[in-house]
């Protein structure tokens, strides 16, 4: 009888520990602009041995978030967050780290716009020349921040946008 009671208590304890809702697991990620931007870079970064963080990434974005990438000619490719996951899920994960270099935040009321320069690395401790600039739009609703969209352009020989951004005051 004691074993049965102990097993039942252990089972209930496990359920309460492991059955956290997304709100409980990721609440700290969306409490401030800094927190959500740190989570934004954290979810994409990691070693090939770490799992993708699709659930957490989805949580920090609004339901209809739009992602836009500009190619070297300025052409766009807007798509949904779910579309972003398809190529990731189809190939093995590689060591990939997006390291933020500089952030400028404009925040008015429940709206925020963030410029964020980043560098792509295969080792978090070794710098690279692969850099880009994100324009990230957020809104505050129901006690938390959401990423509504982001637009990314990579630096190239023709367009030194990250260098220009880093040199701004």
Enumerate the language-model features and the residues they cover.
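A short, polar/proline- and glycine-enriched secondary-structure boundary/capping micro-motif
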Residues: 78-80, 125-128, 157-164
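Hydrophobic pocket/interface hotspot
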Residues: 40, 55-57, 65, 114, ...
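Short beta-strand edge/turn micro-motifs at domain boundaries
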Residues: 131-161
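Bacterial Sec-dependent N-terminal signal peptides
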Residues: 1-24
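A mature extracytoplasmic/lumenal domain signature
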Residues: 71, 116-118, 151
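Surface-exposed, charged secondary-structure patches
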Residues: 66-67, 76-124
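Short, low-complexity N-terminal intrinsically disordered segments enriched in polar/charged residues
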Residues: 19-54, 59, 167-169
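N-terminal, post-signal-peptide region of Sec/Tat-exported proteins
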Residues: 48-76
């Amino acid at each position: 009888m004691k074993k049965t009671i102990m097993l039942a208590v252990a089972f209930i304890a496990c359920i309460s520990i492991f059955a956290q809702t997304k709100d409980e697991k990721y609440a700290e990620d969306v409490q401030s602009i800094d927190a959500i931007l740190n989570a934004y870079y954290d979810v994409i970064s990691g070693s090939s041995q770490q799992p993708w963080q699709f659930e957490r990434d989805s949580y920090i974005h609004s339901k209809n978030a739009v992602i836009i990438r500009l190619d070297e000619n300025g052409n766009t490719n807007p798509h949904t967050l779910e579309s972003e996951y398809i190529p990731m899920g189809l190939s093995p994960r590689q060591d990939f780290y997006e390291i933020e270099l500089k952030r400028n935040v404009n925040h008015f009321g429940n709206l925020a716009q963030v410029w964020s320069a980043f560098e792509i690395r295969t080792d978090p401790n070794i710098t690279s020349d692969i850099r880009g600039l994100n324009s990230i739009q957020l809104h505050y609703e129901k006690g938390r921040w959401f990423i509504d969209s982001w637009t990314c352009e990579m630096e190239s020989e023709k367009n030194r946008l990250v260098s220009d951004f880093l040199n701004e005051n």
